[in-house]
Amino acid sequence: MRIGLTYDLREDYLQRGFSEEETAEFDSPETITGLEEALGALGHDTVRIGSIHDLTKRLSRGERWDMVFNIAEGLRGFAREAQVPALLEAFDIPYVFSDPLVLSLALHKGMAKRVVRDNGLPTPDFALVETPDDIARVKLPYPLFCKPVAEGTSKGIGKSSKVENTAALKRTCLELLARHNQPVLVETYLPGREFTVGIIGTGADAHVLGVLEVSLNQGAESGIYSYHNKEHYESLVTYTLSRGKAETAAAKVALKAWRVLGCRDGGRVDIRLDDHGHAHFLEVNPLAGLHPIRSDLVILARQAGLNHTTLIGMILDAAIKRHGMQSLTTAGPAYLPREVGQTAQPRGQEALTP
C-alpha cells in the first residue's frame, strides 16, 4: 500500500522563529524516520507529504495515496488538529486516526469533559475561565488545577498550576490567559496516582493496550505531570506498566471515554485517582505522540512487550478495518485483542492477567 505521511516538523517552525514551547507538540525527524521504517517493515511504500501547506500543493497537482498516516498537529485554533483530516475527507482519501469532529472536541478539554460527564463518567468538577472577569465566578473548593484548555504535551502546566487560594488562582489564570491566548480550564485537583491508558481500535473493537503509571522522581516539580517534568522525563519521571484494582478501574473509565468521544484507531486517555482511590477522566489524546523512544504510548507498548513497528501495525490495521479496506499489511494483524485491564500481546506471546 502507498501511504502518505502528514506531519508538522518541529525544526521547521523553530527556524521560522517559533519558541521551544510553541513547537512542543510538533514532531522530530526521528519520529518521521521511525514511521517510515515501521511502515516499510510492514511491507508498505511511504511518501513524505509534510504539513497542511505541503498537502494542499500536492493535492492540487493531482497526487493521491492509498492511505494517509496523519500525525499533523496544526498551529492555530481549536480546529488545528482537524485541518488535515478535513482536507483528506474532501478529497475522499482514507487516513489513520480520528476525524475532524473528534479532534476538535478532544483538543478543547472543557468540551470533552462535558461530553464525558454527561455520559455518566467521572471527571473532576471544573470551570472555564475565558476572561479575567470569569475568575471571580469560580466556586470550586481548593486546591484547584489550572491549565490551558487546548494544549498538549503539558504546555502551560508548571509549578503554579496547582493553586491553593483565590490570589493564586487569579495570578495563574491571568498569566495563562495572556501567555496562551485561550481559555483556562480550572478543575478540582486530584491527589491520587496518575495513569495513562493506551487504547487501540474504534468503537466496539477498541481495547486497552495497557495502563502506564506516571510517577514523579525526586527533583521533579511535585504533584503534576508538568511540561518541565515531561521534557526531562529520563531523570524526573518513572513509567511503570502495572496491573491491579486501580489500574483495572482506570482502564474501564478510559475505554468508556474513548468510545463515548468517538476516538479511532489508537491513542491515550489520562486518568487520575481522587483521595478515595476512584478513577477520573482527565483528558484524551487521539493524536498521541509516536516518537520511537520517548513518547508515552510507545513507552507503554514497549513495556507491554511490543516494539515500535508492531504498535504502528496495530494502529494501521485498526484504520484499515475501519475503512473496510482489504488488509494489505504483509505482517498481517499484529495483535490479539484482550479484555479491559489486560495487555494486548503479539501473536505467540501469552497475555498476563492483572
Tell what function each PLM region has.
Residues 1-96, 101, 105-107, 130-136, ...:
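ATP-binding N-terminal substructure of ATP-dependent carboxylate-amine bond-forming enzymes
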Residues 117-120, 243-354:
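ATP-dependent carboxylate activation and anion-phosphoryl transfer catalytic cores
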Residues 165-245, 249-252, 273-280:
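Phosphate-binding site of ATP-dependent enzymes
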Residues 19-24, 158-162, 298-300:
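Short glycine-enriched, charge-decorated loop/helix-capping segments at active-site entrances
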Residues 12-16, 152-154, 220, 291-292:
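Short acidic/His/Gly/Ser-rich catalytic and metal-binding motifs that mark active-site loops
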Residues 46, 94-95, 123, 144, ...:
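Hydrophobic beta-strand scaffold residues
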Residues 1-7, 60-62, 104-185, 191-193, ...:
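Active-site nucleotide/adenylate-binding loops and adjacent lid/helix of ATP-dependent enzymes
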